[in-house]
Regions:
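Conserved catalytic-core segment of nucleotide-activated headgroup transferases in glycan assembly
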Residues: 290-300, 436-511
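N-terminal subdomain of nucleotide-sugar transferases
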Residues: 129-162, 167, 220-336
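Hydrophobic, well-ordered beta-alpha structural blocks that scaffold small-molecule cofactor pockets
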Residues: 1-130
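Short alpha-helical donor nucleotide-sugar binding micro-motif in glycosyltransferases
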Residues: 374, 525, 530-535
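Nucleotide-activated donor-binding/catalytic signature segment of Leloir-type glycosyltransferases, i.e.
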Residues: 349-354, 505-525
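Acidic donor-binding loop of glycosyltransferase active sites
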Residues: 377-381, 533-546, 558
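A charged, aromatic-enriched C-terminal amphipathic alpha-helix characteristic of glycosyltransferases
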Residues: 582, 596-636
């Protein structure tokens, strides 16, 4: 094998008309791409680990940490050039390629990649010891500043990863070297933890959680943020062993609240509770607008109101300080975002529900204020709407019956997953405190945004397929696009609407112009039910989430095309018998089948309406929720 061919040798090897895949379009990958394009040497498809959105090349699109089978699906190549510096990525992609018939001498490695942070140039090596030395040197040159560029942090994250996996003895050396720069240490530890989480390796995650739990008390702000980021990243995985992490995450929360609320330690008396009062904890972790949090807390509150309960929503922003830098989801103050969030969604909440926003910038102040205000409300029950995503419940579950949502996730992703509910079997305390999950009842509003196809330049009699999601840039991959393209080539009056964060240059790469003209991309806002009423089929990508999007579509009588392997994702509401075996070819084949048979299409639409109606009775859900609260209280009082 050409172990270290280098850029020049690679260019000499690649002759005209060769098909080349470049993994990692940064640094040397960009240089390779440019030279190949300038010399018109072959067809290039370039992938970037994270920063492809910063590139303007036609053949580059963003594929953040996708599995190799997703990256290479539908592609053909003669050479693969691994420009990435990540040892793990090289190892995994090489393994995949060789298992699928690529000869070893057709897999080329960059000998080294340099990084320039504007002040100094650093070189990265596969040797962990050299990498550690480079990290330390870089840190010294930057004089301990922890506001590093995102690229540089990712650079270090990769090498912490390789050190921990391949030669763990180096991790202690690095932590010792960083002892005077603890914020930088925590920041990189976070990056490492998230990378491990994405790699779905439970043993490594537990090891990292052990390091995190050892961080000193003065780093409580970072501990607090780590808890949220860990839970958020868990929500994007469907194979994580949640039961192996749940206890550690609770331990992290308890450490945070014990530091911030030290005067509460050792309390044993139970606070006074007023019958019929329910406090609902709502940590704000999403953007203002329609989201799982909006739909869930409003439905919980409304259904309990109809059961005669006195409900109060406690809105708890998860991070309000700009000092968190890129680790927070916004540079704006979260109190302001919270006000926007509530204002945007107040009409969905029953007028009998009271709302209080906890507006404190200091974490200790925020947690203590939240606990004080909830205690003053004297609730009979507490509902943690995000299942321990709010650290307040890590204190209050000792003093109140706390009902948890049946998932460890922070977003819609996985909220309806049976697999997650099953994972709680290890803990009888939590399994007995799960909120029953309905299909939410959404009031049908008059069409106001897209009430006729002329608004979108689509002929009225067209067959319309729709795909919706907040993360479509990573969910709609080349395999789905190419499969849909084949169907649309045959069906000239078929249109495809994509609602979400699609980037045409990256996600819809290489599509014929005629097909491209029949694709519409919309922002994720506006009257989605009105849009759905104009659609024939909801096409669900191979993903874990999509639950609320599918729910809205079903209510409007849209046929659902989803894969059976996504049964534990948003598609669980459809029913196993309605899902498709196989992959994208079979999925898009089902869309074509619905196109070819108007009778089957109408029958399927009507069945979706019926399923939706059967599962959307808010009164039945409210009754079930009250029963769950009573069972939770009984368990709490018995000390289970």
């Amino acid at each position: 094998m050409l172990e270290k061919p280098g850029r020049r040798r690679f260019l000499e090897e690649c002759v005209k008309n060769k098909r080349i895949v470049i993994y990692g379009a940064l640094d040397s990958g960009q240089k390779i791409y440019k030279e190949l394009q300038d010399r018109e040497w072959g067809e290039v498809v370039a992938f970037a680990d994270r920063d492809a959105e910063n590139l303007s090349m036609d053949h580059v699109f963003h594929c953040p940490l996708l599995k190799p089978e997703k990256l290479f699906e539908g592609l053909e190549w003669d050479y693969v050039y691994l420009a990435t510096s990540s040892p793990n990525a090289r190892k995994e992609i090489k393994r995949y390629l060789m298992e699928h018939g690529t000869q070893e001498d057709r897999i080329l490695l960059a000998d080294e990649v340099s990084f320039f942070d504007g002040k100094n140039e650093y070189r990265m090596y596969d040797d962990p010891e050299k990498a550690v030395c480079q990290i330390i040197q870089a840190n010294d040159n930057l004089k301990g500043e922890y506001e590093l560029t995102l690229q540089f942090e990712e650079w270090m994250e990769e090498y912490y990863y390789s050190v921990l996996i391949d030669q763990p003895e180096y991790i202690e050396r690095v932590r010792t070297e960083f002892s005077s720069h603890s914020l930088l240490d925590v920041r990189i530890m976070l990056g490492l933890y998230l990378f491990k989480l994405k790699a779905l390796e439970a043993d490594g995650m537990k090891k990292l959680m052990g390091y995190i739990l050892q961080l000193p008390d003065e780093q409580v702000e970072w501990l607090y943020l780590l808890g949220y980021k860990i839970a958020y990243m868990e929500s994007h995985q469907n194979k994580i062993l949640y039961k192996d992490l749940g206890a550690d995450r609770r331990a992290l929360w308890e450490k945070v609240v014990n530091i911030c609320c030290s005067d509460r330690k050792g309390r044993t008396e139970l606070p006074e509770r007023k019958k019929g009062r329910v406090a609902v904890l709502v940590p704000i972790v999403s953007h203002p607008g329609i989201s799982s949090g909006t739909m869930l807390y409003s439905t919980v509150a409304n259904s309990l109101c109809k059961q005669g309960k006195q409900v109060k929503l406690f809105i708890i922003p998860y991070a309000q300080r700009k000092s968190f830098g890129f680790l927070s989801t916004s540079d704006t103050m979260f109190c302001e975002r919270t006000r926007q969030y509530i204002q945007a969604n107040r009409e969905t909440i029953d007028s009998g529900v009271s709302i209080e926003v906890i507006e404190k910038e200091d974490i200790s102040d925020m947690l203590n204020t939240a606990i004080d205000r909830i205690t003053e409300f004297q609730p009979q029950y507490i509902i943690d709407i995000m299942d321990e995503l709010c650290p307040v419940s890590a204190v209050l579950y000792k003093y109140y019956p706390v009902l948890y949502r049946p998932t460890t996730c922070s977003t819609t992703t996985g909220f309806f997953q049976k697999a997650m509910m099953q994972s709680f079997e290890y803990n009888s305390e939590i399994i007995s405190r799960q909120i029953p999950v309905p299909i939410l009842h959404i009031k049908k509003e008059p069409a106001c945004s897209y009430n006729k196809w002329n608004d979108l330049g689509i002929p009225e009699e067209s067959f319309v397929v729709v795909t919706v999601g907040e993360r479509l840039s990573s969910e709609v991959d080349i395999g789905l696009v190419k499969s849909m393209e084949k169907v649309m080539q045959k069906k000239k009056d078929m249109y495809w609407i994509l609602v979400g964060d699609i980037d045409v240059k990256k996600n819809l790469i290489g599509i014929e112009d005629e097909i491209h003209n029949r694709i519409r991309v919309l922002i994720y806002e506006g009257d989605l039910p009105a849009l759905y009423r104009l659609c024939d089929v909801f096409l669900n990508p191979d993903r874990v989430g999509g639950g609320f999007s599918i729910m809205f579509a079903m209510q409007q009588g849209v046929a659902i095309a989803a894969l059976k392997k996504n049964l534990y994702g948003g598609a669980v509401r459809v029913g196993e018998e309605e899902l498709i075996d196989g992959g994208y070819e079979e999925l898009c084949g089902y869309v074509e089948k619905l196109y070819d048979s108007p009778e089957l299409l109408e029958e399927t639409k009507e069945r979706m309406r019926k399923i939706s109606q059967e599962k959307s009775d808010i009164k039945l859900w409210g009754s079930a929720l009250c029963t769950a609260l009573e069972e939770t209280e009984r368990s709490f009082m018995e000390g289970d």
